[in-house]
Amino acid sequence: MKKSLLAVAVAGAVLLSSAVQAQTTPEGYQLQQVLMMSRHNLRAPLANNGSVLAQSTPNAWPAWDVPGGQLTTKGGVLEVYMGHYTREWLVAQGLIPSGECPAPDTVYAYANSLQRTVATAQFFITGAFPGCDIPVHHQEKMGTMDPTFNPVITDDSAAFRQQAVQAMEKARSQLHLDESYKLLEQITHYQDSPSCKEKHQCSLIDAKDTFSANYQQEPGVQGPLKVGNSLVDAFTLQYYEGFPMDQVAWGGIHTDRQWKVLSKLKNGYQDSLFTSPTVARNVAAPLVKYIDKVLVADRVSAPKVTVLVGHDSNIASLLTALDFKPYQLHDQYERTPIGGQLVFQRWHDGNANRDLMKIEYVYQSARQLRNAEALTLKSPAQRVTLELKGCPVDANGFCPLDKFDNVMNTAAK
């Protein structure tokens, strides 16, 4: 079943018409280099006995067909579609040729060394370049975090730990989550959960969060924010996977507004842990340095296309570390959606003989993910232009490359 489903997805992606119109770009502009920082695609939640999920409801969790945390079959299909769409876009911009494999060393794929990230990269390459010999690079030891993608605290001083915890507490204090917790308690029947009956923890609203910023560990939190994130993450993954709606959160989510209220918990968890400047600049430093090397220091010799696959924590901390302006993603509840990509694009304006940078968030809408909609330039992924505070964009979303270089050089120090 899995193999046939994926075979259909790959074949369908290849057969979809490539005679489509490109996104309009100013006359004389030529795309020269692209770096995509992607979040892995659809995975199964962690619902082991004794986990946060099992402790938070008397209800039984639906079964998944892969172990917790691993990329699902549908996640592979979705990533094939994203790869195919990206290939169409790259061809339309003239960066790679149509109908043939890219020249050697044109495309470089690098993923964190977990199953869901490596598999995501493999499916993306299959969708973008079917039949082409393009390896996915990763650490040899699977199941361990690659330092480039590992968002851990690297400052072991007590002063930094205190600053980081205070920054996370401040970010949490700016969130208004009571309505979200109330709805979550109703959906999970939290009053009847093991947490309430056995541990006497019966109110997510009244409980307190405790943050940590320990050396060589990810920023952490214990308390209702962690519980809320775990539960809403599981509901979101069920929705994307295509579970019947009476099985998604046991049929407890009926409206778009309820999704938005619940998603405040997941987004708030990420914002609290990974988007304060103090924490983000520290945990994203290895990734910032890698991107600076590819897009700035070594750009003349770098591959035309670089594909990086990591996690939502990588994207969230990177957005803060580089000081992007606030953004809104339409048709999505997540701030850093499953399978979504930050797409850095280096362009040359031949008319004015100048180099430019454009950065977009490219992602699948919640509906596209649930319905497994094939992506083409005629039925595209969603695209939202992002702006760095240090590199103001023009009406078409482009900023001067020298200003982008300054942003990267400062962030990579």
From Swiss-Prot:
It is found in: Periplasm. The gene is agp. Keywords: Hydrolase, Periplasm, Signal. InterPro entries: Acid_Pase_AS, His_Pase_clade-2, His_PPase_superfam, Histidine_acid_phosphatase. Its main location: periplasm. It catalyses: alpha-D-glucose 1-phosphate + H2O = D-glucose + phosphate. It comes from Salmonella typhimurium (strain LT2 / SGSC1412 / ATCC 700720). The keyword Cell membrane does not apply. One of its GO terms (molecular function) is glucose-1-phosphatase activity. The keyword ATP-binding does not apply. The active site is at H40 (nucleophile), D312 (proton donor). Residues 1-22 form the signal peptide. GO terms for cellular component: outer membrane-bounded periplasmic space. It is an enzyme of class 3 (hydrolase). Its EC number is 3.1.3.10. Substrate binds at R39, R43, R116, E218. This is Glucose-1-phosphatase. Belongs to the histidine acid phosphatase family. SUPFAM superfamilies: Phosphoglycerate mutase-like. Homodimer.
